[in-house]
Structure formats: C-alpha cells, structure tokens
Amino acid sequence: SGQGVLGPHVAEVLEVRERLAGLDDAAVADLRPLLAPDVTEERHLIPGAAEPTVILLRQGGGLGRTLQASTAVAALAGVADGELSVGQVASAVAALSELNAADAAALRAEMVEATRHLLTTGFLHPGK
C-alpha cells in the first residue's frame, strides 16, 4: 500500500464514486480534473524507440496502486491541472494525432472512461 493514512483517501474515493454515479459521459468530459500530488509516471522504452512499450501511473499514497496507461491516458494525467476539461484534452490529442472523426470519438470515450477510473481510484481529483 501507499504511504500515509488511508481514512481520508477512502472517504474521498467514496464521495467521488457517489458524485460520478450521477454524471453522464458529457458531464465527465466537462470535468477539469487535477492529478493527485502523489502520482508519478514511469515509462519503459526500448532504446531508440519513439514510443514507450509500457506507461505506468503510480500512486504514492492511498492504496499505492499502479495502473498501466495508454499514451492518451498518460497525456490526460500529464495535463490534469484543473485548467482543461477532459473533452478539451481529448480534442487536442485528437488534433495533434490527426485522427479522423470516428477515431477522435473513440479517443474521447477512452479518456472519459479513464477519467472515471482515475477519479474513483484517487489518481485524479474532480477539480472544478
């Protein structure tokens, strides 16, 4: 498990789960999440490769979870400072990746689903 007291972590996670239960995907896409301050990212690369073979998000507190993340989810975590909404991040990544409309919609759905998971496990905080 992570370091620190579990009570506040568990209470926050339960509160977030309850809040998310009432939100549809559009409302989740409008959230402006914040990365929890204890989360770190680890990348495994083959020398000379442009893309990592594995990206891990590690929780230093709470339950000390480790999650494998896609490049898109790692990008979301990397910019989760409360300024941009999940939908804005998805649109920016889709534009930078030059995705067609169907792939952009799939990316948005992936980020919304990942946001739900990252919020309910304490990797992200709801923000605004």
Language-model features, listed with the residues they occupy:
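Rossmann-like AdoMet/SAM-dependent catalytic core
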Residues: 1-68, 72, 77
